[in-house]
Amino acid sequence: GIEVFKVPGRGYRLSSPMTLLDAGEISHGAEGLAWPITVESSVDSTNAEIFRRLDAGVRAPFVLLAERQTAGRGRRGRVWVSPFAENLYCSVVLRVDGGMSQVEALSLTVGLAVAKALQSIGIDGARLKWPNDVLVEGRKISGILLELAGDPADVCHVVVGVGINVNMASDVPAVIRSEER
């Protein structure tokens, strides 16, 4: 949770500053990307929410970010710890014509792109660990989860979920903060 301290005679304050995601600012920074970007305060899973929106008729492509996931997940059903306003939880959905053979190398491509993006902002040593993790100094900083919906031989949607540990709290169990998987 979020630590709040009582300041006698003044009220309350957060234990540390908090910067929330801003869809407008993110859209401005992604100039030239015509895809709708939505930020939610809390979802069970950004990938699961994208599938619900597809089922409700929202057309791909679009981007969904969340401040928190209550049931974040990784490959093979692993839990992805997703506390509020500490890390980045993002999913993107793309329509794929021609079936899943069109996206065979997508997980690798996304992993390399995440590692390169982290390096570009000064996170030295970010490297891809096959098939879907990005590590820094042997510690997992990012995970990628791809899921498909539709006809795997024809028209389908691929949902690309990316979680990046930005400000993982010290009270998160050490096995989650530092485990190399």
Regions found by a protein language model. Name each.
Residues 2-120:
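N-terminal lobe of the biotin/lipoate ligase/transferase fold
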Residues 12, 133-134:
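Positions that flank functional sites
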Residues 98-126, 136-181:
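Long, positively charged amphipathic alpha-helical accessory segments at protein N-termini or as interdomain linkers
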Residues 128-132:
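Alpha/beta catalytic cores of group-transfer enzymes, especially the acyltransferase/condensing modules
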